[in-house]
C-alpha cells in the first residue's frame, strides 16, 4: 500500500544542499512532536473512558503542556490546539461532576 516517493534531484547550490539537510532534521522533529501530541490526547481520552478521574486530570495537565508547545511551534494550528484542549477539558470536568 505504501508507494515509494519519486526520488528528488539533488540541488546544485550549497545553500540548496544545506536546506535539504535541514529539512530532514526539521521533518523528523516535527513528526516526533506530532506523534507526542496525538499520544497525549489519546491518553486523556482513554482515562476519561475508563472513568478514572485522578488519572484523567493528571493526563490532562500533561497534555496541555504538550499541546501548547506544539501549537507555539506551528506544527498544529493554535485554534486546533485550543479546540482539542477545550473539548477534553469538558470531558474531564463532566467526569469529575459525575463521580
UniProtKB/Swiss-Prot annotation:
Gene3D superfamilies: Ribosomal protein S20 (1.20.58.110). It holds the Pfam family Ribosomal_S20p. Keywords: Ribonucleoprotein, Ribosomal protein, RNA-binding, rRNA-binding. Residues 1-20 have a biased composition (Basic residues). GO terms for biological process: translation. InterPro entries: Ribosomal_bS20, Ribosomal_bS20_sf. This is Small ribosomal subunit protein bS20. It comes from Verminephrobacter eiseniae (strain EF01-2). The gene is rpsT.
Amino acid at each position: 500500500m505504501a508507494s515509494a516517493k519519486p526520488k528528488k534531484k539533488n540541488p546544485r547550490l550549497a545553500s540548496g544542499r544545506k536546506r535539504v539537510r535541514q529539512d530532514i532534521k526539521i521533518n523528523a522533529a516535527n513528526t516526533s512532536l506530532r506523534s507526542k501530541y496525538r499520544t497525549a490526547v489519546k491518553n486523556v481520552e482513554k482515562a476519561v473512558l475508563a472513568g478514572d478521574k485522578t488519572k484523567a486530570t493528571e493526563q490532562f495537565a500533561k497534555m496541555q503542556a504538550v499541546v501548547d508547545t506544539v501549537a507555539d511551534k506551528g506544527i498544529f494550528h493554535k485554534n486546533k490546539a485550543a479546540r482539542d484542549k477545550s473539548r477534553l477539558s469538558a470531558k474531564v470536568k463532566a467526569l469529575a461532576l459525575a463521580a
